[in-house]
Curated annotation (Swiss-Prot):
This is NADH-ubiquinone oxidoreductase chain 4L. Core subunit of the mitochondrial membrane respiratory chain NADH dehydrogenase (Complex I) that is believed to belong to the minimal assembly required for catalysis. Complex I functions in the transfer of electrons from NADH to the respiratory chain. The immediate electron acceptor for the enzyme is believed to be ubiquinone. The lineage of its organism: Eukaryota, Metazoa, Ecdysozoa, Arthropoda, Hexapoda. PANTHER family: NADH-UBIQUINONE OXIDOREDUCTASE CHAIN 4L (PTHR11434:SF0), NADH-UBIQUINONE OXIDOREDUCTASE SUBUNIT ND4L (PTHR11434). It holds the Pfam family Oxidored_q2. InterPro entries: NADH_UbQ_OxRdtase_chain4L/K, NUOK/Mnh_C1-like.
Length: 96
């Protein structure tokens, strides 16, 4: 019963993060925050899986390293867009 709770809570939180990501598409910063929330829930699921299967824990550290790099890259893109366009609204600039 407890193991089912360990799997269902991160899955529910992941789905809530995806819902926020899909429904809140006006600002780039809110989208980046919801992406970081999704990555954090994926790390929680990975941590549970690695502890359950008794794998090595360095895979979790690699995942966190790549997610931090993804967050820094997203913030640098946001800063460059704010410098060129003046805000982080998606409607004010054409990315394509």
């Amino acid at each position: 019963m407890l193991m089912m709770f360990y799997w269902s809570l991160p899955c529910f939180l992941f789905l809530m993060g995806v819902f926020v990501f899909v429904s809140n598409r006006k600002h780039l910063l809110s989208m980046l925050l919801s992406l970081e929330y999704i990555v954090l829930n994926l790390f929680f699921l990975l941590y549970i899986y690695l502890n359950l299967m008794e794998y090595l824990s360095f895979l979790g550290m690699m995942f966190l390293t790549f997610s931090v790099c993804e967050g820094a890259l997203g913030l640098s893109i946001m800063v460059s867009m704010i410098r060129t366009h003046g805000n982080d609204y998606f409607q004010s600039f054409n990315v394509l």
